[in-house]
Amino acid sequence: MSATIRIAVDAMSGDLGPRVAIDAAQNFLQCHSDLEITLVGDESQLQQAHSLTGKNSRLHYLHAPDVVTMADDPLSALRHKKNSSMWKSLELLCLDRADACVSAGNTGALLAMARHQIKTLPGIERPAICKSMPVRSGVTYLLDLGANIDVGPELLHQFALMGAALARAAGVANPRVSLLNIGTEEYKGTQVLQQAQVLLQSDNSFTYSGFVEANRIFNGDVDVIVCDGFHGNVALKASEGVAQFIADKIAVEFKRHVFSRVMAFLAWPTLRRLKLQLNPARYNGASFLGLQKPVIKSHGNANEQAFIHALEVALQQVQERVPQRILEQISLH
């Protein structure tokens, strides 16, 4: 890897258009002098934005005429959209012209293209989608979030190893790992979970903390929570929905009458701190763990602040050598 870290950005695939990625890249470069970013997308739109934002010698542009839309079938996109901004961004990793890639595009297409071009690490059966979740103290890493619907016990064990490696890269010396289940008792759950539990219990490369229920995901009792992609995605979407529901209810209640508005004014400093701590933008950027280079999936409707955080995740994974750490972890088993 070169001394200057290089990030390829799919500038076209997000819901809000290329302006978000362009502004985020410009601002992110101002904070990191050892970084270069290549924005990939329609040349005319990128050049127009370039003229508005000014020149930066560490910001580059690569023309890609096509775009992978959210409606595109992943396999169809893989076969027919090799001139898209998503494909060309990943191609920069494949050609060793970038160290990480960030895209806000179609998750299935991004995963299919990444597996085709970047390949998985030796010993990794399938990549998993992983995201940091805000908890009472710090974060907990939850995986898989949708890449693998039907998994066996060996794959869950592999997810645990990858999640533990990511937690170590974030500074957790001895990661605590749990399996998501419908109960904490050892006899609860499917046969796959029972078999996976045996594998995790016998692995001394991390601390296995037993089963964890969904209502304790945010307690901060463990550092890594492992599950199949179906249940992980349901847990993630449910938590996002509940968070938005609570925020909306608080806003409505504080506007109900004069007294509640006074209470809102008095509580504003506390509410502001809480809003900042739980701001989804601070946790944007899901990782495709198990690939040979970091590929980060930004939320499709990410604003500039959220996209900057996805860039931060990409930068940290390169700096902390996350793929290499995963490979080292897997090679011991």
UniProtKB/Swiss-Prot annotation:
Q: Name one GO molecular function term.
A: phosphate:acyl-[acyl carrier protein] acyltransferase activity
UniProt entry tagged with the keyword Lipid metabolism: yes
Which reaction(s) does the protein catalyse, per the Swiss-Prot or TrEMBL entry?
a fatty acyl-[ACP] + phosphate = an acyl phosphate + holo-[ACP]
Judged by the first EC level, this protein's enzyme class is transferase
Cite the entry's keywords alphabetically: Cytoplasm, Lipid biosynthesis, Lipid metabolism, Phospholipid biosynthesis, Phospholipid metabolism, Transferase
Tell me the route in metabolism or biology where this protein functions. Answer: Lipid metabolism; phospholipid metabolism
Pfam families, sorted = FA_synthesis
Instruction: Please state the Enzyme Commission number of this protein.
Output: 2.3.1.274
GO annotation, cellular component aspect: cytoplasm
Q: Has the keyword Isomerase been applied to this entry?
A: no
Q: Which family does it belong to?
A: Belongs to the PlsX family.
List the NCBIfam families: plsX
Q: What is the protein's quaternary organization?
A: Homodimer. Probably interacts with PlsY.
Per the entry, what this protein does is: Catalyzes the reversible formation of acyl-phosphate (acyl-PO(4)) from acyl-[acyl-carrier-protein] (acyl-ACP). This enzyme utilizes acyl-ACP as fatty acyl donor, but not acyl-CoA.
Give the protein's recorded name: Phosphate acyltransferase
Encoding gene per record: plsX
